[in-house]
Amino acid sequence: MARVKRGVTAHAKHKKILKQAEGFYGRRKNTIRAAKAAVDRSKQYAYRDRKNRKRTFRALWIQRINAAVRMEGLTYGRFIDGLSKAGIEIDRKVLSDIAIHEPTVFSALVASAKKALEYLKDTTPNAFEGAVK
């Protein structure tokens, strides 16, 4: 059986790691040991931050919606509650986009949310209505 030497494979692996470490600063871009550690860490950061990006964008959308809704005289929580009671199911990404690019449509959404909140306030019985004074 022929002897297997790993030179070609090792060289290919090293080239692959150094290719991934392009653009890194200092020793991290040209020594295998430092580059391997830096590349591994960068992959961990990339994995973590793909999850964080979703949270960050959701928070941004909520801030934008809140700002637009407050200009209409309502709070974010009441607005979302009104939309759900009105049966309007639009996600926060689309709502923030509408608030920025289509203010008239957004005003109509706010009006329908307010209407749903007012309607439900008028129809729900008061808990203290039958209480003796």
From Swiss-Prot:
The keyword Secreted does not apply. One of its GO terms (biological process) is ribosomal large subunit assembly. The keyword Ribosomal protein applies. InterPro entries: Ribosomal_bL20 (IPR005813), RIBOSOMAL_L20_CS (IPR049946), Ribosomal_protein_bL20_C (IPR035566). Keywords: Ribonucleoprotein, Ribosomal protein, RNA-binding, rRNA-binding. GO terms for molecular function: rRNA binding; structural constituent of ribosome. CDD domains: Ribosomal_L20. One of its GO terms (cellular component) is ribonucleoprotein complex. NCBIfam families: rplT_bact. Binds directly to 23S ribosomal RNA and is necessary for the in vitro assembly process of the 50S ribosomal subunit. It is not involved in the protein synthesizing functions of that subunit. HAMAP family: Ribosomal_bL20. Belongs to the bacterial ribosomal protein bL20 family. This is Large ribosomal subunit protein bL20.
